Amino acid sequence: MKKVTAMLFSMAVGLNAVSMAAKAKASEEQETDVLLIGGGIMSATLGTYLRELEPEWSMTMVERLEGVAQESSNGWNNAGTGHSALMELNYTPQNADGSISIEKAVAINEAFQISRQFWAHQVERGVLRTPRSFINTVPHMSFVWGEDNVNFLRARYAALQQSSLFRGMRYSEDHAQIKEWAPLVMEGRDPQQKVAATRTEIGTDVNYGEITRQLIASLQKKSNFSLQLSSEVRALKRNDDNTWTVTVADLKNGTAQNIRAKFVFIGAGGAALKLLQESGIPEAKDYAGFPVGGQFLVSENPDVVNHHLAKVYGKASVGAPPMSVPHIDTRVLDGKRVVLFGPFATFSTKFLKNGSLWDLMSSTTTSNVMPMMHVGLDNFDLVKYLVSQVMLSEEDRFEALKEYYPQAKKEDWRLWQAGQRVQIIKRDAEKGGVLRLGTEVVSDQQGTIAALLGASPGASTAAPIMLNLLEKVFGDRVSSPQWQATLKATVPSYGRKLNGDVAATERELQYTSEVLGLKYDKPQAADSTPKPQLKPQPVQKEVADIAL
């Protein structure tokens, strides 16, 4: 009995010692100018901007996993597309009169040009090294079949020729020509099937995880930057002087630490919503989140991989979210080429791939539960789509693959679970709540804390998104001559549009292609195509979009 008592006493003393140590460490405040929560591409990009703009500012980055770029930024957890609307048909919706709207496509392409310029500038500075390790030329193609879809692609191609950003795009309805562009897609296909494709040679495959690792490695070279891994944010508290005290737990030894920061950026991917709520700022009350995961079929068989060099995007089926469009992609991951097909939607209540099953429940509050319910009731087609995706069998997924690769063999493919994407649900005065595709910077009125919510187009537009954050939070500094000069050196087209300016578009594409080692040939005249038949579209209930 005495031994048991002694053992229990020693355990109690030990636990008390750990608790006291945690409290002692928490009382030792670390001070920093900027706290970056999350070790992904958004925090890395913002940190890189600030390092150039204010080199004397101290920065601390905290990441809950054992390394950076292990969640959504990881190359295996996303599609790796340099989203520039060259092939993504959801960015060019069809109007009621049958015409094609290109405004969204132009905006997406403009944004990606900023990312290209930002990365090229970092290569010239020596921050990013060996461009082929993170970006490679992979042609972007749209591919459709069936009379209506072919007519849509004709109209899309014609509409995009109005923009200087889409010059150089090719169009064909010829089986032989399309087979030359994408052999996998055409071999074994019915020669009588009506098909059409567009192809743009300057498309890219991007490893966002590698970009993240290199950016953070460069930040670490400065003594006023600190990276803390296996460190999870447990609390955020605003101080009277508008600084923030953030409690961070060391997941390895159980201790805690307080970090006092003048500015906090929450770039924690799916976890950003919960941390934003934890901050208590009133702006957070308008938001909720709904997690959707994605799976891909992967082939590493050389017979498949060496027979396909393109990203080929199709058109979403009727009743499916426009962004759910399937695609068969060349990827360059871990230094080698692979082919991915998907995505297939999955459901988990986790907000991160390495998150908790309680994430969805714990983010639901009295202020956002009604917007969530309204979104669910107003988007029954989306709910049906997600249920149908979750119920897919191995055979179902393989049949979907064969629509894009008729001669596919099951033994060449394996299923891979990619990352989680938390869709934004925002309070809406008219509808109660709406599902928002895209990303959104949410900040307090004082500009002391900001979070990035949303999932698409995500990493490919990290550079323009963080520019938007700088303008929103550091408006006075952004307008200063010093910051203006630095930003224009970092992003040469900053403050102006490339669309409509052929010379400027070609100049920036030539510059970034040379620095990043990408293919770029001066665009030739547009292909002649059959005139599209613009037919009025039947009135259909709009399907809410989601990012997979």
From Swiss-Prot:
It catalyses: (S)-malate + a quinone = a quinol + oxaloacetate. NCBIfam families: mal_quin_oxido (TIGR01320), PRK05257.1-1 (NF003603), PRK05257.1-4 (NF003605), PRK05257.2-1 (NF003606), PRK05257.2-4 (NF003608), PRK05257.3-2 (NF003611), PRK13339.1 (NF009875). This is Probable malate:quinone oxidoreductase. It comes from Escherichia coli (strain SMS-3-5 / SECEC). Belongs to the MQO family. Keywords: FAD, Flavoprotein, Oxidoreductase, Tricarboxylic acid cycle. The gene is mqo. InterPro entries: FAD/NAD-bd_sf (IPR036188), MQO (IPR006231). GO terms for molecular function: 2-hydroxyglutarate dehydrogenase activity; L-malate dehydrogenase (quinone) activity. The keyword Flavoprotein applies. Its cofactor is FAD.
